[in-house]
Amino acid sequence: MKNTSSIQAQFGAHLKKLRHQSGLSQEAFADKCGLDRTYVSGIERGVRNPTLEVLNVLAQGLEIEIKNLFEFK
């Protein structure tokens, strides 16, 4: 079984990649999602564990389906 922190780090790196592909700064993305920039930073660094509700907000902010947030290895 994978280490939870490892999965959080992988998810965060993937989210950061998706955000960059969308051409959004961390601050612009956080504003678009209605979240604090430091919270988004924590998710991207793998130190915050977002809820399902926040995952949905992140997907909407990136204008992607929520399942695309989990397409990382």
Predicted regions and their residues:
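Hydrophobic micro-packing sites on short alpha-helices
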Residues: L55-A59, L69-F70
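Residue-level signal for the short linker/turn that defines the boundary of a DNA-recognition helix
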Residues: A13, G23-L24, P50-E53
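Short C-terminal boundary/hinge segments that cap the last helix of small helical domains
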Residues: E63-K73
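Alpha-helical residues within the helix-turn-helix
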Residues: H20, D31, Q60
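Residues within the helices of the helix-turn-helix
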Residues: K16, E27, N56
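Short, conserved catalytic or interaction motifs in soluble domains
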Residues: R45
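A short, Lys/Arg-rich alpha-helix, primarily the initiator
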Residues: M1-Q21
